[in-house]
Amino acid sequence: MDKRHDPSRRIIAPHGTQLQCKSWLTEAAMRMLMNNLHPDVAERPEDLVVYGGIGRAARDWQSYDKIIEVLKRLEDDQTLLVQSGKPVGVFTTHSNAPRVIIANSNLVPHWANWEHFNELDKKGLAMYGQMTAGSWIYIGSQGIVQGTYETFVAMAKQHFNGSSAGKWILTGGLGGMGGAQPLAGTMAGYSVLTCEVDETRIDFRMRTGYVDKKATSLDQALAMIYAANQSGKPVSVGLLANAADVFTELVTRGIVPDVVTDQTSAHDPLNGYLPQGWSLEYAAKMRKTDEAAVVKAAKQSMAVQVRAMLALQAAGAATTDYGNNIRQMAFEEGVTNAFDFPGFVPAYVRPLFCEGIGPFRWVALSGDPEDIYKTDAKVKELIPDNPQLHNWLDMARERIAFQGLPARICWVGLKDRARLALAFNEMVKNGELSAPIVIGRDHLDSGSVASPNRETEAMLDGSDAVSDWPLMNALLNTASGATWVSLHHGGGVGMGFSQHSGVVIVADGTDEAAVRLGRVLWNDPATGVMRHADAGYDIAKNCAKEQGLDLPMLGA
């Protein structure tokens, strides 16, 4: 019997102001863990899988139940330790310490590979936490919509003279991460064709407003794309097909999309990528009987897809890796030029990271959408001179359906995170918001990750693989008074390829919270500016000087 599978479970986080825990700090952790498993949020909630292949919120259902039980009794001077999704200890700390400290999927480097992890996973000794799955701050596909939108806007500026009109994007994958691309693309003015092998995922994205139409053949999908481009009204199409097949067929036909990328779960060849010619049912059977054959077939198909991406790039498509490590997988299968197209971070996002700008997010614990709309207005009030940000907030309200507890993603940096958080805390204090707000971010942020094939690819000083930075980030956030802190391995790009940390803090309207918010939400993005200044980026050096950061070696 699989202790991780229970189809009878239907988890919905409590709404309103009635507490089940002893404080809003522990109530927030409980609600956010539960929200990660909401049926409109998680990919396979019955298996505790939130997104990204096998990214889980808890190791098994027994561990989940025990975490909830402990959070309900946890005192204001206690800290719960969670080891790869399993609650292992409660210790006396102090009121400004984190209420929860989480470590997920961490392995000694020599053993940091999928083969060793999968053995531990089968024995019930480990859990893959992805990034925000095991750190309890996933908010559905909205979590990466703005970053994806900003990337596609940057691509239009860089490749199409600033206009995406009549342009279309080819991509793959409609899981928790890939599901953001169709909506982000149409918001940025492109039509989007996304290949997906699991029809239930296409239907889910259509139900939640991320995909407009479904197609069952390439010809049908292309007809939808061409009609939309002629009408001037972008459309997103979910095509029920294998990405490797479709990408290759387009090369054969000589059809060149304007933008080519991919967000299948290529980081996990065993669980995340369906080989060409395989059905979902056959793959599920083979995972139980011959894991090595699954991995080999998946990586061979990834090699086919990457060769097609390279061919489309050579034919003129703006081509980028969107952070799923597909280039690495193809390289290991003999595609020696797999890295000839860039990752999206060095190509389009790094200047933002240099100023500590990244995916800041917050959640209304009340469950009331009005609390989010009021915070949207507060963001506009406090950042009046950023029309692109205002445009994002307007589009988000109009086009993004909340999944689970109402939430908002908003890319802001060192200059703004702390003051926004303090304003939200004041809104809770004066009753403008009906309940406290949870504030967090993706682990994909400026100072919280080491990932040489994604966030830290092609660093100016060659420090791509140095992972001291996310470790220091987690330690500093713990010392600064975050509500819960997490340290993970393997998120986004798979085992052996990344280390990263997460932070969440509660704005409960108290003066004590204000002090913690001011520290955490200054220090956290400041580590990103520090990391990039240390690597030699002038934008980061200037930001550090302007904001008065004390970096002893700056200018040395």
Curated annotation (Swiss-Prot):
Keywords: Cytoplasm, Histidine metabolism, Lyase, NAD. Its main location: cytoplasm. The keyword Cytoplasm applies. GO terms for cellular component: cytoplasm. It is an enzyme of class 4 (lyase). GO terms for biological process: L-histidine catabolic process to glutamate and formamide; L-histidine catabolic process to glutamate and formate. Pathway: Amino-acid degradation; L-histidine degradation into L-glutamate; N-formimidoyl-L-glutamate from L-histidine: step 2/3. Its cofactor is NAD(+). It is found in: Cytoplasm. SUPFAM superfamilies: Urocanase (SSF111326). The keyword Lyase applies. The active site is at 410. It comes from the Bacteria. GO terms for molecular function: urocanate hydratase activity. NAD(+) binds at residues 52-53, 130, 176-178, 196, 201, 242-243, 263-267, 273-274, 322, 492. It catalyses: 4-imidazolone-5-propanoate = trans-urocanate + H2O. InterPro entries: Urocanase, Urocanase-like, Urocanase_C, Urocanase_central_sf, Urocanase_CS, Urocanase_N, Urocanase_Rossmann-like, Urocanase_sf. Binds 1 NAD(+) per subunit. Its EC number is 4.2.1.49. Catalyzes the conversion of urocanate to 4-imidazolone-5-propionate. Belongs to the urocanase family. This is Urocanate hydratase. It comes from Shewanella frigidimarina (strain NCIMB 400).
